[in-house]
Structures are given as structure tokens and as C-alpha cells.
């Protein structure tokens, strides 16, 4: 963002509500538990949290974010999640009728939810779904760098799936919402019930 100093930016905050009715004007994402940060990708990668404070992110995770980003410079909004556990894999056993579950150890991951800048081009005034499309084009998922999933329909059935995975809250975002760094945006709502 040529006209805005990146170090002065902070993540946008969602408004909190107890309930929200499904609407075609919104998407639904899981509310990840962890440390929210804006990650700058460039010569010196860094993470900035609320109130513009530096987030002490693991160096190897910042390096993984840089490696998985196809742009020279970018600003990503996301969550550093500690203790992330994937679903266990079913592995074939020695015998024809044998199988076992391979448990995957917990690890730290970065889950990207938005893209605010790419190669000096600000995306703050770009609608959310277009920013998500560009995020998917710029950031390649890996075991340690993830893109948050989202849906536009079927909130309740997807909510059931997310609850089974341990999510207790959800974020609904207006599809045409713009990004307002450091502000609370009424078009992003964190909810407990759908």
C-alpha cells in the first residue's frame, strides 16, 4: 500500500452477535481460535496484530508463508493457530482386512482469511469475494499455510460440520464488504448461533 504505511495497519474487527439468519448476501467461515495478525510478505516478513502491535510469530511459519506466496509483496490477514490437528488418516494394515488410524501430531499453522495488498496494489476497496479469489491465486495452501474455507449457502448444515470439528463460533461476512484496517466492521459478524 504505497499511500499507507503497513506498520500502521491492524486487523479489521468483526462485530459480535449472538444469532444471525442466513442471507445470500453473506458468506460463512469458521472462527479460528488463535492470534489474529496482518502478515506482510516482502524482504522482511512481519506480523502485526490489533493496535498495530508486533505479533511474535514463529520464524519458520513466516518463512513458510513467504514460500507459499507467489507475489513479491503482499499483506495477508489471518490467524496463527497453535495446536492445529488434522483429521487422522486411515492406513492399510499388514493384512488384507487390517487398517489403523495414523494420528498426526498437533502443530502451528497460519490460516489466511483475506488479502489486503498484492505487489503494491491496495485491495482495501475491492469487494470481499474478489479479494478471496485473488488470495486463492496468490497463496498456495500447504500443511502449515491454509486458506480458510467458506460457503455462501447451507449455513446450518455447514455449521453442524464445523461444530463436529470443534468450532464454537462462526464469522459471517457480507460478500461486497470492503476492508477497514483497525476498525470494527458491521458487515463482518462473529456469531454463536445460526
Residue ranges and their predicted role:
Residues 1-194:
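Catalytic cores of nucleic-acid ligases and guanylyltransferases
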Amino acid at each position: 500500500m504505497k499511500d499507507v504505511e503497513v506498520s500502521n495497519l491492524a486487523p479489521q474487527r468483526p462485530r459480535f452477535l449472538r444469532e444471525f439468519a442466513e442471507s445470500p448476501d453473506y458468506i460463512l467461515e469458521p472462527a479460528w481460535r488463535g492470534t489474529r495478525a496482518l502478515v506482510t510478505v516482502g524482504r522482511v516478513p512481519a506480523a502485526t496484530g490489533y493496535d498495530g502491535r508486533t505479533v511474535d510469530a514463529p520464524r519458520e511459519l513466516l518463512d513458510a508463508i513467504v514460500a507459499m506466496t507467489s507475489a513479491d509483496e503482499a499483506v495477508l490477514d489471518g490467524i496463527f493457530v497453535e495446536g492445529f490437528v488434522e483429521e487422522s488418516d486411515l492406513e492399510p494394515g499388514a493384512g488384507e482386512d487390517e487398517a489403523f488410524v495414523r494420528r498426526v501430531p498437533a502443530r502451528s499453522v497460519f490460516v489466511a482469511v483475506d488479502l489486503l495488498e498484492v505487489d503494491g496494489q491496495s485491495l482495501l476497496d475491492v469487494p470481499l469475494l474478489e479479494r478471496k479469489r485473488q488470495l486463492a491465486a496468490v497463496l498456495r495452501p500447504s500443511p502449515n499455510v491454509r486458506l480458510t474455507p467458506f460457503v455462501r449457502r447451507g449455513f446450518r448444515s455447514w455449521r453442524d460440520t464445523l461444530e463436529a470439528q470443534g468450532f464454537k463460533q462462526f464469522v459471517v461476512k457480507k460478500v461486497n464488504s470492503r476492508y477497514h484496517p483497525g476498525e470494527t466492521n458491521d458487515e463482518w459478524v462473529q456469531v454463536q448461533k445460526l
